[in-house]
Amino acid sequence: MHESYIRIGKILKTQGNRGAVRVLPLTDYPERFKNMSRVQVSLKGFRTFFTVGEVYHHKNFIIIKFKEIESMAAAEKLKGAFLEVGRDELVPLPEDRFYIFDIIGLKVYDTGGRNLGRVTDVLQTGANDVYVVDTGGKPLLIPALKQVVKSVNLTEGKMVVELPEGLEEL
């Protein structure tokens, strides 16, 4: 899946009375907000850029004061909006690591070349991610482990896996 814009946060509500907003980070790299000078805000199909002023962490949230927003009433209108960045603004990942939105939609093959289906979701379990593959029947749950996932080719849109014995019967 190759989106033009990637969601990195969601504005939940206002924070204080000076027009700051409370953002739920939708990224594994919440520290990125401190280095941003501007961000695209998307709400109900409309997108606009805002200049990032103050940024600080509060519990599990990011508090952002946009320079263009001067009141709590103006900030209230942004409630429910998403903060987005372009693909070129993503944090570079280490080799053999992928963004979830790039994994979803990949065709999955076993090492023998048999088409197992397409990745429809990624479950984040804590220990390791699990790829949900639509097989046309019962979903196949594939652990995202190096010994299982043999290759991922985003250009070709495919993943090759070596399924542990008995996994397909679960």
Curated annotation (Swiss-Prot):
Belongs to the RimM family. Binds ribosomal protein uS19. The PRC barrel domain binds ribosomal protein uS19. An accessory protein needed during the final step in the assembly of 30S ribosomal subunit, possibly for assembly of the head region. Essential for efficient processing of 16S rRNA. May be needed both before and after RbfA during the maturation of 16S rRNA. It has affinity for free ribosomal 30S subunits but not for 70S ribosomes. It is found in: Cytoplasm. One of its GO terms (molecular function) is ribosome binding. This is Ribosome maturation factor RimM.
